[in-house]
Amino acid sequence: MAATRRQQIIWPRLLCFLALCALLIALLIWGGVQLLRPAADEVMEKMYPRTYQELIETYSAEYDVDPYLVYAVCKIESNFDPKAQSNVGARGVMQMMEPAFDWVQYRMGDESGTTYDQMYQPEVAIQYGTCMLSLLQKEMGEDERVILASYHAGMGAVQAWLEDPAYSSDGETLDTIPYSDTNWYVEKVLETKAIYQQLYE
């Protein structure tokens, strides 16, 4: 009887103690997360910087393009390196090829004398690259996968995919991107855009 009575006294106290311990551990974990979050955000902001922020914000507003998409393209294309040049000849922060430059210049009506050699200048590269994203948005529709695939593989290839039921079920979006490098590029840019939004919105 005495043992039973002791158990009746001890068990509620033990359960209460364990509950308090669990609460204390939860509070410690929560506090640790709150303390570490600013440091983690700082590390992420260094990994995903808003380089050329003024230029990107200015031309994104001018051409009605999501600035986070422009940051993501710059990050994946060149890691914001203005002197970047690919093995196929794409130049600058947004890695534009010369035929694309000529097309954008014509569509912009730019008669300032800007040349492809100036694509190594961040302002020229960002203006032309952002304008190209805007033009693709108007030509190919609002779907970002389609826009980015067009930026990477060209409008002709993407239009052919949209017309092929194997790649597009509705003619407006891409269910599958047949070029593995373009598929990787699109997914990587969208993933990077989401990180920028999470960090800076």
Residue ranges and their predicted role:
Residues A2-T58:
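N-terminal export signals and maturation junctions of secreted/periplasmic proteins
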Residues V33-E201:
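Catalytic glycan-binding domains that act on GlcNAc-containing polysaccharides
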Residues M1-A2, Q7, L28, Y71, ...:
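A general, composition-driven signal for non-globular sequence regions
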